[in-house]
């Protein structure tokens, strides 16, 4: 079905919707109920998110402006209007973040023995120690760069922290400008000072001073014979988006490496951050030297680059962090549960196999509450070592360093199995890591492919082929999250282990589509982008519309990271207007307006921001009291529906459908970490009534799993 584009007055600008999401992240940092070091972490996430937003989204808009493009977005704004509006929204948020760091976070940390000091606050013993540290550990790696007729303005790399200094030559009386880059990639941003030197009783747990201040107050050693008159800090963000035309690249890996080199060098400057005290005349030197526009200048009252607050999470102050969470092995995969499932006739070696459990029943996994290591990684590990397994195929979008899954794939190849890995080289900001893994896998005998021309492969799928009683049986994993051991502990994701023949055959054909010249146009059970997912999702919504029109009611529940696609939004509006009840749980961007009388009054939207990043996608359709439920890798965005390879699988087991419905209920009833989207597009955080019980979905899920209650 083809839907008309949604009217601009009914569509929220995606960039502003993203800023609203990041504002909710910042709110976690500002919330005094958040443990103190977790506040620092959320502040760091806010900054890191903002860096990527400028490197990709703002860079794209600036490129459009420079190209003279005036075409409006779905909400009716030109690229230039979007840039100006983005700035207006960001400035107060950045001020809130800095205000929180200066006035709250630093002071509260002192109460727990953590002193984040300015250089000028150090006592004489501490200054002596830090100055000696500068000479031995910092000074040798610094390179001061002067700017004059013989020395053009130096290149300033992306996300680098720098000192702009004005120095005076006493002999000539001439003032010169110089730039010093802070070596923050090789030296910690906060330089720790031995607590014994503080003279404070009781002794601090941790005393540190910002690295850039250590350098700034020792500049005289970099410019002997010169007088340091002024110094100021600045930070640069450059265009870091890689857009490669696959058809023009004979060797995609080579093209990616060239693109990564360009990224390291950096594209056009898209943001210049300076400390608030920098005078305009110095700002103008930077603007001229780096060809920056005035509207890209951000004055910051405080430390630049607060993403480095991530480092505070390493402090041994567990009482200032969320309680540690270690997931459990999925009950059906635990050894005691397996023993109950097995027939007495089954041999001991078969009892040990995860495949025997999957054959009996689909397994629905929920991370991080259920361990990734004892489910997905165990699935791959057993496949690698099982002599009956003939082949393994997997899609890799983002994976972790020292990945157990990579190790298992290599081991499988060494055992003589047919192993194929699709490594998506275009996974943004993981391109370099994926290139290294691709080469490592190839050297180990794994067949490595890079996907379909013109598409990014985002699906999370594994296919294992096993020889059983003179026949081949396939086992599959289809998930919502990456095969990444680290993020599996931090993100909420779902996965399905199954041996259903129709799913297995669909995955065989999907991998053929990814690795060969297959032009598969239909699948039995999977919804696959860009082939069947858009049409399938539209059909499911249209069916609810038809039920509502015929008086049978209609109900849609969906959980995702983002809802941006205008055609899907238009259909949801239509569904609301005929009485379909629509409940959406959307962590990030949402471009529809809910709750508008006579238009979208049957649509509600909440966003959950908690200790775990909500990453799972669930699509639930009432279907006249015969629910259909899907999970998978896709959000409802044009890129996911049309420009990526995605896979969404139906959930077939009735108790697993019920489990996902209970899960959605938990999220919808959250009154602590849920934000209600208002009819004007803004969000309000829910607050539990003083006399009511607090419901935090993520904490409730931790508690339920610890009690052994969930059964899927």
From Swiss-Prot:
Positions annotated to bind ATP: 49, 491, 587, 615
Catalytic activity as recorded in UniProt: [phosphate](n) + ATP = [phosphate](n+1) + ADP
Entry GO MF terms: ATP binding; metal ion binding; polyphosphate kinase activity
Cellular component GO terms held in the UniProt record: polyphosphate kinase complex
Enzyme Commission number: 2.7.4.1
Modifications after synthesis and translation: An intermediate of this reaction is the autophosphorylated ppk in which a phosphate is covalently linked to a histidine residue through a N-P bond.
Keyword set includes RNA-binding: no
Active site: 458
Residues at which Mg(2+) binds: 398, 428
Pfam families: PP_kinase, PP_kinase_C, PP_kinase_C_1, PP_kinase_N
Enzyme class, first EC level, given as a word: transferase
Cofactor dependency: Mg(2+)
GO terms under biological process: polyphosphate biosynthetic process
Keywords: ATP-binding, Kinase, Magnesium, Metal-binding, Nucleotide-binding, Phosphoprotein, Repeat, Transferase
Known role: Catalyzes the reversible transfer of the terminal phosphate of ATP to form a long-chain polyphosphate (polyP).
PANTHER family in the record: POLYPHOSPHATE KINASE
Family label: Belongs to the polyphosphate kinase 1 (PPK1) family.
The protein's name: Polyphosphate kinase
């Amino acid at each position: 079905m083809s839907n008309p584009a949604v009217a601009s007055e009914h569509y929220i600008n995606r960039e502003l919707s993203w800023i609203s999401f990041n504002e909710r992240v910042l709110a976690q940092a500002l919330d005094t109920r958040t443990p103190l070091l977790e506040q620092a972490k959320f502040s760091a996430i806010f900054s890191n998110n903002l860096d990527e937003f400028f490197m990709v989204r703002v860079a794209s808009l600036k490129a459009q402006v420079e190209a003279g493009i005036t075409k409006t977005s779905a909400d009716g704004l030109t690229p230039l209007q979007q840039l100006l509006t983005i700035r207006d929204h960001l400035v107060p948020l950045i001020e809130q973040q800095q205000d929180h760091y200066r006035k709250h976070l630093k002071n509260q940390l002192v109460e727990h023995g953590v002193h984040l000091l300015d250089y000028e606050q150090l006592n004489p013993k501490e200054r002596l120690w830090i100055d000696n540290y500068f000479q031995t550990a910092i000074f040798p790696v610094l390179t001061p760069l002067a700017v004059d007729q013989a020395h053009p303005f130096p290149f300033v790399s992306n996300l680098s922290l720098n000192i702009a200094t004005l120095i005076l030559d006493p002999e000539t009386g001439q003032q010169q400008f110089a730039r010093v880059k802070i070596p923050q990639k090789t030296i910690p941003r906060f330089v720790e000072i031995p607590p014994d030197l503080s003279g404070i009783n009781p002794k601090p747990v941790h005393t540190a001073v910002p690295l850039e201040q250590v350098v700034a107050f020792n500049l005289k050693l970099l410019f002997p014979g010169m007088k340091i008159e002024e110094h100021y800090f600045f930070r640069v963000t450059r265009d870091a988006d890689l857009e490669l035309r696959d058809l023009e690249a004979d060797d995609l890996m080579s093209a990616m490496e060239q693109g990564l080199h360009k990224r390291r060098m950096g594209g056009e400057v898209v943001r210049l951050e300076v400390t608030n005290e920098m005078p305009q005349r110095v700002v103008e030197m930077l603007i001229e030297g780096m060809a920056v526009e005035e509207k890209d200048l951000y004055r910051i009252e405080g430390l630049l680059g607060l993403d480095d607050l991530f480092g505070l999470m390493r402090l041994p102050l567990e009482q200032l962090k969320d309680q540690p969470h270690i997931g459990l092995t999925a009950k059906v995969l635990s050894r005691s549960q397996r023993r109950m499932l097995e027939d007495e006739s089954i041999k001991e070696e078969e009892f040990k196999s995860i495949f025997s459990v999957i054959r009996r029943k689909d397994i629905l996994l929920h991370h991080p509450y259920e361990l990734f290591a004892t489910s997905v990684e165990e699935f791959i590990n057993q496949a690698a070592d099982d002599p009956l397994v003939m082949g393994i195929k997997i899609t890799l979008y983002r994976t972790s360093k020292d990945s157990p899954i990579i190790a298992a794939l290599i081991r499988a190849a060494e055992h003589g199995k047919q192993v194929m890995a699709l490594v998506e080289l275009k996974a943004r900001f993981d391109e370099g890591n994926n290139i290294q893994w691709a080469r490592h896998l190839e050297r180990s005998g794994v067949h490595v492919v890079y996907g379909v021309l013109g598409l990014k492969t985002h699906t999370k799928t594994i296919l294992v082929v096993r020889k059983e009683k003179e026949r081949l049986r396939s086992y599959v994993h289809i998930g919502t999250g990456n095969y990444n051991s680290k993020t599996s502990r931090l993100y909420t994701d779902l996965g399905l282990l199954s041996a259903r023949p129709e799913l297995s055959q669909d995955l065989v054909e999907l991998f053929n589509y990814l690795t060969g010249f297959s032009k598969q146009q239909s699948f039995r059970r999977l919804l696959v982008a860009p082939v069947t997912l858009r049409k399938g999702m539209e059909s499911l919504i249209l069916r609810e519309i038809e039920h509502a029109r015929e008086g049978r009611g209609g109900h849609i529940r969906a959980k995702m990271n983002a809802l941006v696609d205008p055609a899907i939004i238009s259909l949801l509006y239509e569904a609301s207007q005929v009485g379909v009840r629509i409940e959406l749980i959307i962590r990030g961007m949402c471009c529809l307006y809910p709750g508008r009388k006579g238009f979208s009054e049957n649509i509600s939207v909440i966003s959950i921001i908690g200790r775990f990043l909500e990453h799972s996608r669930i699509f639930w359709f009432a279907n006249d009291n015969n629910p259909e439920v899907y999970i998978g890798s896709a959000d409802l965005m044009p890129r996911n529906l049309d420009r990526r390879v995605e896979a969404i699988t139906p959930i077939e087991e009735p108790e697993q459908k019920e489990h996902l419905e209970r899960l959605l209920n938990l999220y919808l009833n959250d009154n602590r970490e849920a934000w209600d989207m208002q009819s004007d597009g803004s969000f309000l955080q829910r607050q539990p009534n003083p006399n009511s019980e607090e419901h935090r979905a993520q904490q409730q899920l931790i508690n339920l799993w610890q009690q052994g209650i969930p059964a899927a």
